[in-house]
Amino acid sequence: VPIEFKRGKGPREGGVWEPDRVQLGAQMLVLRANGYTCDHGWIAYRDARRRERVELSAELATEVLALRDRALELA
């Protein structure tokens, strides 16, 4: 299970910042592509002393792959 440690605090209303969620989603897809079972990960915000579970949903996977494709277009 990937755990991403971040400096600072997460969003005031709870949850995670969108770039952090996408980064963790990409890490989970890489793990899956290499034969690991991975359906969730954690983001821990140091200053808030809390961690949030992030599920690898179909929507997150689609978003990550779309961003990857867009980055490849720009390269």
Predicted regions and their residues:
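Amphipathic, alpha-helical segments enriched in basic
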Residues: 2, 6, 20, 39, ...
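Conserved catalytic cores of phosphodiester-cleaving nucleases, focusing on short active-site segments
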Residues: 1-13, 24-29
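Short, conserved glycine- and acidic-residue-centered signature motifs
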Residues: 17-23
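Metal-dependent nuclease catalytic regions and adjoining charged, substrate-binding loops involved
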Residues: 14, 30-75
